[in-house]
């Protein structure tokens, strides 16, 4: 998964010419994207750390990408890997060929399939100009395939990342530290899974519907509806743990379930008491069902009380007749 250090490219907040440097396309491929705001400088002198501002959308791949490349037969002697030149209407494809000196054989490696390529695309292998005196480049055969997958966004670093584009990436949104601000409606895609780690914040300007919801952080600015809630028992029962907190309303969709990532720990915490999994200032609507693996006591269950979703294990009652 590639890591994007926003301050390294000048895509940080505050300069008058910031929008002149916005990329035309910012596509998140199958492996996803990490944005680390730890070194996002607020000024050109790099004397203070500021927030990162993305005025563009983080998009899912569209159209077709480069699926495979077949290099031509060897016509010279090469000393190492070579980049492949890709020309066409699309963008984002990156590939090279490894060269086996003993076997005199090329092995193509596609780092990114790119998107929006068509049959007019050309892929070229540079000729071994220095070694055999030839010039120009040799054309490679290739195949295209529909872009069916897209990764997610992981936000790291203490400073904020502000999104101003209507994003369409299809993977999970993960806020590991600091604040991720969805500054316009759609900046955080609806329907994607959402993880907000302890101490992190997702700030919204509109309501958001997500798939699986997970974490111990905070969500403010909008109502949240989730299809499922993901529970980590170790985190929930940790000393000083606080629940996922929604400043507005949290709604569990019909048929929503609570699923544990570490179900083996139900036995570990069977005497751990009641813990809050989620809290909403404007109440919680809908009641999810706790999924219990085979062999786990049905005494475990979730319920709502005073704007909280609680997990508990009901202890049996012993009646003694005298």
Positions of the model-derived regions?
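Short, structured interface segments
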Residues: 140-146, 224, 307-312
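Extracellular disulfide-bonded cysteine-rich modules/repeats
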Residues: 298-302
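Short, T/G/N/S-enriched strand-turn elements that build extracellular solenoid repeat scaffolds
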Residues: 5-9, 14-16, 35-39, 152-155, ...
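Feature for peripheral, non-core segments
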Residues: 1-157
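Glycine-rich active-site loop/lid that clamps phosphate-bearing ligands
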Residues: 282-297
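Enriched but not universal
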Residues: 315-322
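Extracellular beta-strand/loop-rich repeat segments of large surface/secreted proteins
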Residues: 200-274, 282, 313
């Amino acid at each position: 998964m590639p890591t994007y250090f926003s301050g390294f490219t000048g895509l940080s907040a505050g300069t008058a010419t910031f929008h002149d440097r916005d990329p035309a396309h910012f596509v998140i491929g199958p492996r996803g994207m990490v944005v680390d705001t730890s070194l996002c400088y607020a000024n050109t002198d790099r004397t203070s750390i500021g927030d990162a501002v993305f005025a563009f959308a983080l998009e899912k791949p569209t159209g077709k990408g480069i699926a495979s490349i077949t290099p031509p037969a060897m016509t010279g002697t090469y000393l190492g890997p070579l980049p492949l030149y890709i020309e066409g209407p699309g963008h984002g494809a990156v590939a090279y060929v490894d060269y086996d000196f003993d076997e005199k054989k090329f092995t193509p490696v596609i780092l990114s399939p790119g998107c929006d390529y068509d049959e007019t695309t050309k892929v070229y292998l540079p000729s071994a100009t220095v070694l055999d005196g030839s010039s120009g480049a040799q054309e490679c055969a290739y195949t295209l395939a529909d872009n069916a997958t897209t990764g997610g966004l992981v936000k790291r670093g203490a400073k904020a990342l502000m999104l101003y584009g209507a994003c369409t990436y299809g993977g999970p949104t993960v806020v590991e530290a600091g604040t991720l601000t969805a500054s316009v409606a759609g900046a955080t895609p609806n329907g994607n899974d959402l993880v907000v780690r302890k101490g992190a914040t997702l700030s919204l300007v509109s309501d958001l519907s997500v798939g699986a919801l997970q974490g111990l952080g905070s969500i403010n600015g909008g109502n949240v509806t989730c299809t499922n809630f993901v529970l980590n028992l170790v985190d929930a029962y940790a000393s000083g743990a606080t629940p996922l907190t929604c400043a507005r309303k949290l709604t569990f969709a019909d048929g929503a379930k609570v699923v544990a990532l570490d179900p083996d720990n139900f036995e570990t915490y069977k005497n751990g008491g009641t813990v809050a999994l989620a809290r909403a200032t404007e109440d919680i609507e809908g009641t999810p069902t706790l999924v219990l693996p085979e062999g786990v006591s049905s005494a475990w269950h979730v319920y709502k009380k005073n704007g909280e979703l609680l997990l508990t294990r009901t202890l049996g009652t012993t009646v003694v007749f005298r």
